[in-house]
UniProtKB/Swiss-Prot annotation:
GO terms for molecular function: acylphosphatase activity. It catalyses: an acyl phosphate + H2O = a carboxylate + phosphate + H(+). Keywords: Hydrolase. Gene3D superfamilies: 3.30.70.100. It is an enzyme of class 3 (hydrolase). Pfam families: Acylphosphatase. Residues 4-91 form the Acylphosphatase-like domain. This is Acylphosphatase. It comes from Geotalea uraniireducens (strain Rf4).
Amino acid sequence: MKIRAMVTVKGMVQGVNFRRYTQQTAMRFNVSGWVKNLPNGSVAGCFEGEENDVAALIDWCRQGPGSARVSGVEVERGEFTGEFDDFHIAY
């Protein structure tokens, strides 16, 4: 079953290539959507794909790249829309 997840990652997650690594990991898991920095220092993302693939990407976000220090991940699940053709970094 395909799903959508709106994700917010908190901690030291900006300035450590978190978005780029998230994009690369999403592509490995065949997840589409976007990721972007927020003004409060967090990173937000919208992930769409097969439930297991989205769950795997969310699990990866709980650790992030080695240079990141993730303190928490908030997830809000929603209905799959299919609006994304790829996974990109939003600004």
